């Protein structure tokens, strides 16, 4: 176990620009949306809020929309294959737009497996102005601004731009829309009976969403966010502090002008063996979303209940908590939580003179060692747990070694 020392991390000042509201939703492309949605309902207490499929007029693609607090996942799958050249050219049920979407989803699944396609941002201001600035500065214009309406809930404006690899950002203004998700989706009010039998999980929102890049990929994508979306460098720490015994990485966090959206970007750094970032890029076949962090007011209760629901987390050696007790004894900071309970649950702690952060990382939620989930509680602390990186890397390295990928 490597004893953590005080890590030098840099947090930068914010910029003006109030239009960003937060993360709107995360869209996944998966092989079986119904089963994928059921996993998050069963394991993490999500509830289905909307649905799109053949019953709603979507003849080729199905989407299950689930939420926990303000965190929204959209699990999307094709329900038709793309076998054969010119598939569905003569099928009146499959439009040209359907064929394009089917091809996009199938290609994504072939290349990446199940994974995140769209990290959508909610914006209160002018979608067209944000989209135009992004496109003028080099962002791929995936979908121009458009307004969708339904008679019951009003109208919604959205547009989409490309970001790293095959990932995109939808830009959404919900000011004039009262529905649970988007026009064209059927509202779902019936909760899964499993949620009446299992303890509830209370997430507040998506705290951050992390993108893994290949070697030397961070600086170009950070410049993209600065130029295209007027984001700025919010936080950074070097590879000397983000390492384990065998591997290392480099990370920069970019944030929206008003800092309500934060996007850490990671890349591999030189080490003795393959890093977790390299493993991700190899199995995902490129850059992509590595993990999504859910913020909660009470991580002890949340993690206790997640474990009861069957979620598996990375394990932290007891030496970490001996070191934590020693470091805390030299400060004036007192944790509200019992360290013995944190140790039992394998929850990590980082702190400074102003406050502290509690965090824990799940094991991968897919068979491919790509995407996982973080649960985080912030107590007057805006960093990203730099003091825990060495311990985290060692935990990841143990899992990599079990898979034969270290």
Curated annotation (Swiss-Prot):
User: Which Pfam families does the protein's record reference?
Assistant: Glyoxalase (PF00903)
What does the record note about the cofactor? Binds 1 Fe cation per subunit.
Provide this UniProt record's keywords sorted from A to Z.
Dioxygenase, Iron, Metal-binding, Oxidoreductase, Phenylalanine catabolism, Repeat, Tyrosine catabolism
Repeat as UniProt keyword: yes
Listed under catalytic activity are: 3-(4-hydroxyphenyl)pyruvate + O2 = homogentisate + CO2
Signal peptide stretch: none
The cofactors required by this protein are: Fe cation
GO BP: L-phenylalanine catabolic process; tyrosine catabolic process
- Provide the VOC domain boundaries: 22-174, 205-363
Looking up InterPro entries in the UniProt record yields: 4OHPhenylPyrv_dOase, 4OHPhenylPyrv_dOase_C, 4OHPhenylPyrv_dOase_N, Glyas_Bleomycin-R_OHBP_Dase, Glyas_Fos-R_dOase_dom, VOC
Q: What is this protein called?
A: Probable 4-hydroxyphenylpyruvate dioxygenase 2
Q: Which organism is it from?
A: Aspergillus fumigatus (strain ATCC MYA-4609 / CBS 101355 / FGSC A1100 / Af293)
């Amino acid at each position: 176990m490597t004893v953590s020392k005080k890590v030098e991390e840099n947090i930068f000042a914010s910029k003006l620009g109030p239009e960003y509201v937060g993360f709107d939703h995360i869209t996944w492309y998966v092989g079986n949306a119904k089963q994928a949605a059921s996993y998050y309902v069963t394991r993490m207490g999500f509830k289905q809020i909307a649905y799109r499929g053949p019953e709603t007029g979507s003849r080729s693609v199905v989407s299950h929309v689930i939420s926990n607090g303000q965190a929204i996942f959209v699990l999307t799958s094709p329900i038709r294959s793309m076998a054969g050249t010119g598939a569905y050219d003569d099928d009146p049920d499959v439009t040209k737009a359907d064929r394009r979407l089917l091809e996009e989803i199938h290609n994504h699944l072939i290349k990446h497996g199940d994974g995140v396609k769209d990290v959508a941002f909610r914006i209160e201001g002018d979608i067209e102005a944000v989209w135009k600035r992004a496109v003028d500065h080099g962002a791929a214009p995936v979908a121009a601004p458009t307004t969708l309406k339904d008679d019951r809930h009003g109208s919604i404006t959205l547009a989409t731009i490309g970001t790293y690899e095959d990932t995109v950002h939808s830009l959404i203004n919900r000011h004039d829309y009262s529905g649970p998700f988007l026009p064209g989706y059927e509202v779902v009010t019936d909760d899964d009976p499993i949620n009446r039998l299992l303890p509830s999980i209370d997430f507040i929102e998506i705290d951050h969403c992390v993108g893994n890049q290949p070697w030397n990929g961070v600086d170009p994508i950070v410049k993209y966010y600065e130029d295209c979306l007027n984001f700025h460098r919010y936080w950074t720490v070097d590879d000397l502090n983000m390492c384990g015994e065998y591997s290392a990485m480099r990370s920069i966090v970019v944030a929206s002008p008003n800092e309500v959206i934060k996007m850490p970007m990671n890349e591999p750094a030189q080490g003795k063996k393959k890093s977790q970032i390299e493993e991700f890029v190899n199995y995902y076949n490129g850059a992509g979303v590595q993990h999504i962090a859910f913020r909660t007011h009470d991580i002890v209760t949340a993690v206790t209940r997640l474990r009861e629901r069957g979620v598996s987390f990375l394990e932290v050696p007891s030496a970490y908590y001996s070191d934590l007790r020693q470091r805390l004894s030299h400060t004036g900071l007192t944790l509200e939580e019992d360290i013995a309970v944190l140790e039992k649950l394998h929850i990590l702690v980082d702190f400074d003179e102003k406050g502290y952060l509690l965090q824990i990382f799940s094991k991968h939620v897919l068979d491919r060692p790509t995407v996982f989930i973080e649960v985080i509680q912030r107590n007057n602390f805006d960093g990203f747990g730099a003091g825990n990186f060495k311990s985290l890397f060692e935990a990841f390295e143990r899992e990599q070694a079990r898979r034969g990928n270290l």
